[in-house]
C-alpha cells in the first residue's frame, strides 16, 4: 500500500483544498466534500500538488498511508468530475422509472421497490431497463448502486435481474431430465 501513498495527487484547476488539523475539505465545481483523516499522516498542499508523509514504516502506517491517499484522490476526482455507476435490468417486465427523486423498480415481485436517493446522489433512467447512479462521493455512489443491484441480483440459470453494465454473469446448466 505504501507505493500508492507515495504518489502525488495532482489538484486540477478550480479545486480548492483546505486542511484544518487533518480535517480536509475539498471544494470544486461539482460540490464540496469534508472528511477527517488519521492524525499521524501529514498532508501537505503545495501549489497544485498534494503529498502525504507517514511518520514511520510500520505495517499499520503503510496501510493507512495508502488508504488516506486513495480517499483524498477520490475526493478530488469526485468534486471535479464526479462518479457514475450504470446498471441494466434483464428480465420480462423488469422496469425502472423515476418519481421525483425516488427510483421505482418493478422486478418481478408482488410489489414495487422504491429507492430514495441519498443526499448528493442523482438517478437517471435513460430507458426502462437502464439506471445510472451519479454523485461526487465514490463510496455513496457504489453503496447505492450495490443496494439497487441487491434488490434482484442476477440469478445463475437465466441471468435475470439487475446487474452492472459490462458485468459477466456465468450461467449454470439446468437439470438434465431422464
From Swiss-Prot:
PROSITE patterns (UniProt xref): RIBOSOMAL_L6_1 (PS00525)
GO molecular function: rRNA binding; structural constituent of ribosome
Alphabetically ordered keywords of this record: Ribonucleoprotein, Ribosomal protein, RNA-binding, rRNA-binding
Domain of life, source organism: Bacteria
Any Gene Ontology biological process: cytoplasmic translation
GO terms under cellular component: cytosolic large ribosomal subunit
Protein task: This protein binds to the 23S rRNA, and is important in its secondary structure. It is located near the subunit interface in the base of the L7/L12 stalk, and near the tRNA binding site of the peptidyltransferase center.
Protein family: Belongs to the universal ribosomal protein uL6 family.
Quaternary structure and partners: Part of the 50S ribosomal subunit.
Protein name: Large ribosomal subunit protein uL6
Amino acid at each position: 500500500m505504501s507505493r500508492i501513498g507515495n504518489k502525488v495527487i495532482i489538484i486540477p484547476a478550480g479545486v480548492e483544498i483546505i486542511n484544518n488539523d487533518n480535517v480536509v475539505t475539498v471544494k470544486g465545481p461539482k460540490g464540496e466534500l469534508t472528511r477527517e483523516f488519521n492524525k499521524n499522516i501529514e498532508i501537505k498542499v503545495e501549489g497544485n500538488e498534494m503529498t502525504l508523509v507517514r511518520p514511520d514504516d510500520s505495517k499499520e502506517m503503510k496501510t493507512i498511508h495508502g488508504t488516506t491517499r486513495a480517499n483524498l484522490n477520490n475526493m478530488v476526482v469526485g468534486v471535479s468530475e464526479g462518479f457514475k455507476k450504470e446498471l441494466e435490468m434483464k428480465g420480462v417486465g423488469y422496469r425502472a422509472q423515476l418519481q421525483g427523486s425516488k427510483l421505482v423498480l418493478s422486478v418481478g415481485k408482488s410489489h414495487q421497490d422504491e429507492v430514495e436517493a441519498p443526499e448528493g446522489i442523482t438517478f437517471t433512467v435513460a430507458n426502462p431497463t437502464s439506471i445510472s447512479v451519479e454523485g461526487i462521493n465514490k463510496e455513496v455512489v457504489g453503496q447505492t448502486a450495490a443496494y439497487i443491484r441487491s434488490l434482484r441480483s442476477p440469478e445463475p440459470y437465466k441471468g435475470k435481474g439487475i446487474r452492472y453494465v459490462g458485468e459477466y454473469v456465468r450461467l449454470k446448466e439446468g437439470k438434465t431430465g431422464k
